[in-house]
Amino acid sequence: MDATSKPAGKCPVMHGGNTVSGKSVTEWWPNALNLDILHQHDTKTNPLGTSFNYREALKTLDVEALKADLRALMTDSQEWWPADWGSYVGMMARVTWHAAGSYRVTDGRGGANTGNQRFAPLNSWPDNVNTDKGRRLLWPIKKKYGNKISWADLIALAGTIAYDVAGLKTFGFAFGREDIWAPEKDTYWGDEKEWLAPSDGRYGDVSKPETLENPLAAVQMGLIYVNPEGVNGKSDPLATAAQMRETFARMGMDDEETVALTAGGHTIGKSHGNGSAANLSPDPEAAGPEYQGLGWINTKGRGIGRDTVVSGIEGAWTSEPTKWDNGFFDMLFKHEWTLTHSPAGASQWAPITIAEEDKPVDVEDASIRTIPMMTDADMALKVDPIYREISLKFKDDQDHFSDVFARAWFKLTHRDMGPKSRYVGPDVPAEDLIWQDPIPAGSTSYDVAAVKAKIAASGLSVADLVSTAWDSARTFRGSDKRGGANGARIRLAPQKDWEGNEPARLSRVLSVLEPIARETGASIADVIVLAGNYGVEQAAKAAGFDIAVPFAAGRGDASAEQTDADSFAPLEPLADGFRNWVKKDYVVSPEELLLDRAQLLGLTAPELTVLIGGLRVIGANYGGAAHGVFTDKPGALTTDFFTTLTDMAYSWVPTGNNLYEIRDRKTGAARYSATRVDLVIGSNSILRAYAEVYAQDDNREKFARDFIAAWTKVMNADRFDLI
């Protein structure tokens, strides 16, 4: 407002819309089940509409022209944000690193697969200072190619091209990442209320990195991985090394990859801390409209070039920071280092003595030499015995270092894309990599009817068939596109021994289904799903509905050699509300664990509801438990679960931890037993609304058809070949 503006008055209309302030429903009732994570990324938020197909749009992309434009960008310094040494390679590598580096293997969330760096909280993390400038530099290219290139793909490609321009022979690149259009609500980044709060709150014992809270992979709120100044900002390279090992492992990286990514990430570019962070404007989410989505603008000085402030650490790591070489290891091992501070006050390491020719030149004036630096994470590579051995090997063999880094960079930027079948473009590497969870192509030429006939004659119960198929498919994670029924890894270690898969029952069922696969030429993966489908069809028929469950042949069977057993450990279910099972008591409630699994499976709240009701009456509970089986006709796909839950003839009485009885209000007699997961379908107002739909007399067939549709969605969740 200008100086003549009147004082703000009360608006007679705006109180009707909660656009800025006021408590949300979840703030008023913080213990209520928050179903928002199932409703995010709705088609209503996507401006491209439901008919847009990104994979089809990619077919029209001129990839070579795009790469040429990106190469030109790397040396096209802009006055509003000048390039260090006339090159943006370091900046673009950082933008990509900080997008991909948020991935964690525990739940598959984070990473570069969605373009989430454009939105809160990542766009405003302290560790992402000035990535907003990098994305703004990319905007003219995004504008030019439009819908043919997603932001997610462009951000991932930018860093890859940066390394190419710097001189690295990169391993390859795949397109296929689709953009989201709003912040992710499902990702838990920690419960701290302030940026860079001490690490102690997310560790059982901060001196024991393995006690970092799951599923987190970063040591502090707002960081990508470790604090470059040391644990809680206190320099101790050995302690930092221990945190690095755990953090990178939670990103899916081993020690060699950790060293390669750390050193390779610091071979080009520099850190910026030549000034005071107090002079910076708020982050993008907090900045005023005049900043137009940018943040961290220096309000009291140039704030660009040599005066830029980002992490607060100041300096380059190598003598030639725009060139891919072995300069990082040469610098690290050639000198002795002493702890010092940057102009911004950040802890960093400086060489005790250094020859003038080994110093990097100033980013603006090549006649000026500057002092290089190392972070605590860099020094960790020198002092940790394992990291040191790897580092020295890299130092003495640049070709080996370059190859390991190129592969690790490819893994970093593609780990959350899922299997190779999702890769698009001319630069997809031919080599199959174990972390891609390779699956051989399956047959589609066998007689499906003959397989079903053998399943029907197998003597296996409907509950056995349905439970085994569900257990095989439920491992799918929409976050990083891992898991699922394709590959039939449920028959391999470690899945065959997971408690949640009921190993004894699973072994018995597989001993019947595997011979059927061999006899018919079908994959065991297909037979498992087809058996589940047959079970659902029989349950529907028992309820009076003759409905065929859709089936698409073509799943393959992965081998033990194609399966990294250790990497599948994070996919083990610790609870499955759909089968009414929890491994043990957790701080998180069973219904919250159910919600998390439903979100990873890509289910909506109505689909969650219909699957719970159907699986209960079919009798698919873990161990054959009776909890939630609100029917006198188990094995039939009836609406009995919902009619019982909504019947006021019953009361619900707690009988133990996570256990309840449903009792007749008049006689007090116990009718059924239930868990919290069962009762939340009737207690949560949103889920109850869906339950009432299925309890209606006119929706019995609708329930059966909706259940089959949701079931098929889960069975086909990993069938990217059908897209």
Curated annotation (Swiss-Prot):
PTM statement from Swiss-Prot or TrEMBL: Formation of the three residue Trp-Tyr-Met cross-link is important for the catalase, but not the peroxidase activity of the enzyme.
PANTHER family assigned to the protein according to its UniProt record, in alphabetical order: CATALASE-PEROXIDASE, HYDROPEROXIDASE I, BIFUNCTIONAL CATALASE-PEROXIDASE
GO cellular component term, pick one: cytosol
Tryptophyl-tyrosyl-methioninium (Trp-Tyr) (with M-251), cross-linked positions: W97-Y225
UniProt remark on cofactor binding: Binds 1 heme b (iron(II)-protoporphyrin IX) group per dimer.
Cross-link Tryptophyl-tyrosyl-methioninium (Tyr-Met) (with W-97): where in chain: Y225-M251
Protein name, UniProt field: Catalase-peroxidase
